[in-house]
C-alpha cells in the first residue's frame, strides 16, 4: 500500500466547512495492489497515515475519495470522524466525498456555522416576515416568529452546513465542543424573534420549579433590540403596589392585566434582562436577538383573547404563573455601545450566561474560551475568519 501526506490543501477543499484542526494534513492517493483487497491492509495504512501526520506535527487529517468507490467510502466512513461534504475537480466530472478526523483529544475545533429551525404559523400567531425582509431568511410562513439559530430543543434543532443537528455534534464531540459539563443537557438557546403583533403576557419558571413540574430547565433570558418601529414597547415587570391577590383576581375574572405591568418604550440597541419569575411581553413591531436557557417552558397569563383559525383561544396557565411570579423583579437594562475602537464589551453576566458585544472598527481577535464555548452572531457588516 502507498499514500502521500501533504500540508498543502487543494483549493477545492476551501469550499467546505471543516470542523477540526488549525494545522491539517491531507492524505492523497491511498492505493494498494489488487491482491491485498479484503485483507484490512487499507485500514492499517490509513491508521499508519494518521500516526505519521501526528508525528509530523499536524493536528488533523483530511482526505477524499470518489463517491463511486464504495469500498473506500465504507472504509473512510468507518475510520474518519466525519464527512465534510463533496467536491469536484476541474479535470474530473466525478464527485468526491471528503472526510476529516482530529489526531488527538487536544485538537482544536473550528467555528461551526449553524442554520436555524423555525417556529411559525399557529406556533407563533404574532409572527411576521421581518426575518425575511431584514435578514433575508428563507422563512416557511408569513407568520414566522422565531429563527432558532442555535438550538437543541427536540424537533426544533439547528443544523450545521453538513446537516448535523446540534445534538449529534455534541454526542460526537463532547467536551471538545462544549467544554465542561458536556455530559449535561445543552444549556442555552439563541434565537431571532420577529413580532408583528404583541406576544402574550408571560412568565417563566426557575430551574427548581421547572425540573419538578416540567422535567426541563427553567428559563432566564435577555433581549437585544435589533429593529424597533416608532413607538414600539415592551411590558417589563409588575408595577409598584400590585399584589399577588389583586393579580389573581384580575386573572380569574379575565381582566386585561396590562395596566398592572410597566410599559417601556424601546429603541434599536436596547438590552433587557428577564430573570425567571419576572412578568414580561414583547410588543408589536419589534425584531430582537434573544439568548436564554435551553427551555421552551412558558406560562401565559394573558393573550388578548386572541383566537386561532379554528376560533379557539390559546390556553392560559394561571395556576403555574401565580406559583412562579416574583412581583419584586424588575430586571436589568443596558445599551449596545457605539463602535469606537476594537474591544469586547460585556453587556450582561448572570449565572446562566454572559452577553458581550464585539465592537469592531477594523479587526478584533477573540481569544479561545478555555473550558467552555462561545456562540458568535454577526449581525451586520462583519466577516468571521479563522485559521484552519
Predicted regions and their residues:
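C-terminal amphipathic alpha-helical segment
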Residues: 299-373
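Conserved metal-binding segment of the jelly-roll/cupin
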Residues: 201-204, 266-284, 293, 388
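Conserved acetyl-CoA-binding loop-helix of GNAT-fold acetyltransferases
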Residues: 32, 38-51, 55, 74, ...
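A short beta-strand-loop-beta hairpin characteristic of the jelly-roll/cupin
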Residues: 231-267, 368-388
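Transition-metal
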Residues: 104-242, 303-330, 355
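Conserved catalytic-core motifs of GNAT/GCN5-like acyltransferases
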Residues: 10, 64-65, 77-96
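Conserved GNAT acetyl-CoA-binding A-motif
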Residues: 53-65
Amino acid at each position: 500500500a502507498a499514500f502521500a501526506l501533504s500540508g498543502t490543501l487543494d483549493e477545492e477543499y476551501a469550499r467546505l466547512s471543516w470542523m477540526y484542526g488549525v494545522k491539517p494534513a491531507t492524505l492523497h492517493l491511498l492505493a494498494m495492489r489488487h491482491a491485498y483487497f479484503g485483507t484490512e491492509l487499507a485500514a492499517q495504512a490509513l491508521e499508519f497515515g494518521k500516526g505519521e501526520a501526528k508525528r509530523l506535527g499536524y493536528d488533523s487529517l483530511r482526505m477524499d475519495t470518489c463517491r463511486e468507490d464504495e469500498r473506500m467510502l465504507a472504509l473512510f466512513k468507518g475510520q474518519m470522524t466525519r464527512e465534510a461534504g463533496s467536491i469536484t475537480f476541474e479535470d474530473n466530472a466525478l464527485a468526491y466525498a471528503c472526510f476529516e478526523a482530529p489526531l488527538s483529544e487536544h485538537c482544536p475545533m473550528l467555528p461551526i456555522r449553524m442554520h436555524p429551525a423555525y417556529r411559525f404559523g399557529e406556533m407563533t400567531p404574532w409572527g411576521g416576515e421581518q426575518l425575511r425582509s431584514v435578514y433575508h431568511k428563507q422563512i416557511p410562513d408569513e407568520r414566522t416568529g422565531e429563527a432558532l439559530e442555535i438550538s437543541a430543543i427536540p424537533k426544533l434543532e439547528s443544523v450545521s452546513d453538513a446537516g448535523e443537528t446540534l445534538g449529534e455534534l455534541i454526542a460526537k464531540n463532547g467536551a471538545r465542543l462544549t467544554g465542561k459539563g458536556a455530559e449535561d443537557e445543552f444549556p442555552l438557546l439563541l434565537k431571532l424573534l420577529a413580532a408583528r403583533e404583541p406576544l402574550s403576557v408571560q412568565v417563566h419558571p426557575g430551574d427548581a420549579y421547572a425540573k419538578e413540574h416540567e422535567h426541563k430547565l427553567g428559563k432566564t433570558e435577555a433581549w437585544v433590540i435589533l429593529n424597533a418601529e416608532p413607538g414600539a414597547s415592551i411590558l417589563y415587570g409588575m408595577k409598584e403596589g400590585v399584589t399577588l391577590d389583586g393579580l389573581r383576581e384580575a386573572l380569574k375574572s379575565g381582566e386585561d392585566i396590562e395596566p398592572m405591568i410597566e410599559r417601556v418604550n424601546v429603541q434599536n440597541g436596547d438590552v433587557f434582562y428577564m430573570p425567571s419569575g419576572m412578568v414580561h411581553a414583547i410588543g408589536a413591531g419589534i425584531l430582537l436577538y434573544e439568548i436564554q436557557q435551553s427551555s421552551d417552558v412558558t406560562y401565559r397569563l394573558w393573550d388578548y383573547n386572541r383566537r386561532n383559525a379554528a376560533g379557539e383561544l390559546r390556553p392560559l396557565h394561571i395556576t403555574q404563573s401565580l406559583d412562579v411570579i416574583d412581583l419584586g423583579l424588575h430586571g436589568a437594562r443596558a445599551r449596545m455601545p457605539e463602535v469606537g475602537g476594537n474591544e469586547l464589551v460585556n453587556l450582561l453576566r448572570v449565572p446562566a450566561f454572559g452577553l458581550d458585544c464585539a465592537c469592531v472598527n477594523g479587526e478584533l481577535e477573540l481569544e479561545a474560551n478555555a473550558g467552555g464555548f462561545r456562540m458568535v452572531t454577526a449581525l451586520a457588516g462583519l466577516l468571521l475568519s479563522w485559521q484552519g
